[in-house]
Amino acid sequence: MNVTLQSAKMIGAGLATIGLTGVGAGVGIVFGSLVMAYARNPSLKQQLFGYTILGFALTEAVALFALMMAFLILFT
C-alpha cells in the first residue's frame, strides 16, 4: 500500500473521531442535569432516570457512529 494513502487513512480516521469529544461533553450534561433534577424534585426519581438513560443511549449512538466511520476509513 502506498505510504501516502496509508497516512491519509490515518489522518481521516483521526479526524472521524473528533465527534467523540462532543459525546463526552453531552454525557456530562445529561448526568449533570439528572443530578440537578433530583435535587429539585426527588419524587420523580424513576421517571427522570428513564429519561436519562434514553438521553445517554442517544448520545452514545453518535459516538458509535463516529467510531464505526473511523474503523471503516482505517480498515478499507
From Swiss-Prot:
<dbReference type="GO" id="GO:0031966">
    <property type="term" value="C:mitochondrial membrane"/>
</dbReference>
<dbReference type="GO" id="GO:0045259">
    <property type="term" value="C:proton-transporting ATP synthase complex"/>
</dbReference>
<comment type="subunit">
    <text>F-type ATPases have 2 components, CF(1) - the catalytic core - and CF(0) - the membrane proton channel. CF(1) has five subunits: alpha(3), beta(3), gamma(1), delta(1), epsilon(1). CF(0) has three main subunits: a, b and c.</text>
</comment>
<keyword id="KW-0138">CF(0)</keyword>
<keyword id="KW-0472">Membrane</keyword>
<dbReference type="InterPro" id="IPR035921">
    <property type="entry name" value="F/V-ATP_Csub_sf"/>
</dbReference>
<feature type="transmembrane region" description="Helical">
    <location>
        <begin position="11"/>
        <end position="31"/>
    </location>
</feature>
<dbReference type="InterPro" id="IPR038662">
    <property type="entry name" value="ATP_synth_F0_csu_sf"/>
</dbReference>
<keyword id="KW-0067">ATP-binding</keyword>
<protein>
    <recommendedName>
        <fullName>ATP synthase subunit 9, mitochondrial</fullName>
    </recommendedName>
</protein>
<keyword id="KW-0406">Ion transport</keyword>
<dbReference type="GO" id="GO:0008289">
    <property type="term" value="F:lipid binding"/>
</dbReference>
<dbReference type="Pfam" id="PF00137">
    <property type="entry name" value="ATP-synt_C"/>
</dbReference>
<dbReference type="GO" id="GO:0015078">
    <property type="term" value="F:proton transmembrane transporter activity"/>
</dbReference>
<feature type="site" description="Reversibly protonated during proton transport">
    <location>
        <position position="60"/>
    </location>
</feature>
<dbReference type="InterPro" id="IPR000454">
    <property type="entry name" value="ATP_synth_F0_csu"/>
</dbReference>
<comment type="function">
    <text>This protein is one of the chains of the nonenzymatic membrane component (F0) of mitochondrial ATPase.</text>
</comment>
<keyword id="KW-0812">Transmembrane</keyword>
<dbReference type="GO" id="GO:0033177">
    <property type="term" value="C:proton-transporting two-sector ATPase complex, proton-transporting domain"/>
</dbReference>
<keyword id="KW-0496">Mitochondrion</keyword>
<dbReference type="InterPro" id="IPR020537">
    <property type="entry name" value="ATP_synth_F0_csu_DDCD_BS"/>
</dbReference>
<feature type="transmembrane region" description="Helical">
    <location>
        <begin position="53"/>
        <end position="73"/>
    </location>
</feature>
<dbReference type="InterPro" id="IPR002379">
    <property type="entry name" value="ATPase_proteolipid_c-like_dom"/>
</dbReference>
<dbReference type="GO" id="GO:0015986">
    <property type="term" value="P:proton motive force-driven ATP synthesis"/>
</dbReference>
<keyword id="KW-0446">Lipid-binding</keyword>
<keyword id="KW-1133">Transmembrane helix</keyword>
<keyword id="KW-0547">Nucleotide-binding</keyword>
<keyword id="KW-0813">Transport</keyword>
<dbReference type="GO" id="GO:0005524">
    <property type="term" value="F:ATP binding"/>
</dbReference>
<comment type="similarity">
    <text>Belongs to the ATPase C chain family.</text>
</comment>
<keyword id="KW-0375">Hydrogen ion transport</keyword>
